A protein has these predicted regions:
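Bacterial N-terminal signal peptides
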Residues: 7-15
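Sec/Tat signal peptide C-region and signal peptidase I cleavage site
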Residues: 18-24
Length: 207
């Protein structure tokens, strides 16, 4: 009986002294996403499927239109992700961001971009160029460049896909790569006529 009493007291003490769980960071972002990969059109990965070309090689631009991480404003922040899907990624943050924004993006990567963060080989600041219009998208970083054109459908309007099963792929507009290139010590590729898209990404914490 005494042993049970002492055990109960011990458990109670542990419960009382256990440190509180850290609160989830407060964050939210709305971003324009532009990507080209090596899959044929339209990339099945965006529907929750498997790539139709392995390895899937891609470049994704994330341009944050509005958002924050805790008290840091992220509006205007952009970064480029070069990736070999599920294997590795190299992330280039626009060199115009502040030191505080850089820290915020680095903290946000494992939360909002966990897939890219898991295989991250490098996270560096670098010059990034981007030119996004309704008919043409061009963006580049130190080792990668993408040039893609919109695909027209019925009535000459852009081909769009609604309600894809991922918050990063809303307002999805279909593009086709004109030139999609990467050259580094890790890999080299050059694709044309492959999948491309622009979309809106909106994500945030629950608090």
């Amino acid at each position: 009986m005494m042993r049970k009493l002492f055990a109960g007291i011990a458990i109670g003490c542990l419960t009382l002294t256990a440190p509180p769980r850290a609160a989830e960071p407060n964050w939210h972002l709305v971003a324009t996403v532009a990507e080209s990969c090596s899959c044929t059109i339209s990339c099945p990965c965006n529907f929750g499927g498997e790539p139709n070309r392995n390895p899937c090689e891609g470049n994704r631009l994330i341009a944050i239109k509005s958002g924050h991480y805790e008290t840091t404003d992220l509006a205007g922040v952009s970064f480029l992700v070069t990736f070999n899907m599920r294997n590795w990624s190299k992330i280039y943050l626009n060199d115009k961001v502040s030191a505080q924004q850089e820290k915020a993006v680095e903290a946000l990567l494992p939360i909002a971009f966990a897939g890219f963060h898991r295989g991250m080989l490098s996270f560096t600041k670098a010059p990034i160029t981007m030119d996004i219009t309704e008919k043409r998208v061009r963006f580049s970083g130190p080792e990668s460049s993408v040039d893609m054109e919109v695909m027209s459908g019925f009535g000459g309007k852009p081909v769009q896909i609604k309600n894809l099963p991922n918050p990063a792929y809303q307002d999805y507009t279909q593009y086709k790569s004109v030139a999609h290139k990467h050259a580094s010590d890790k890999a080299t590729w050059s694709h044309s006529g492959t999948n491309g898209f622009t979309s809106t990404m909106e994500l945030g914490s629950k608090n």
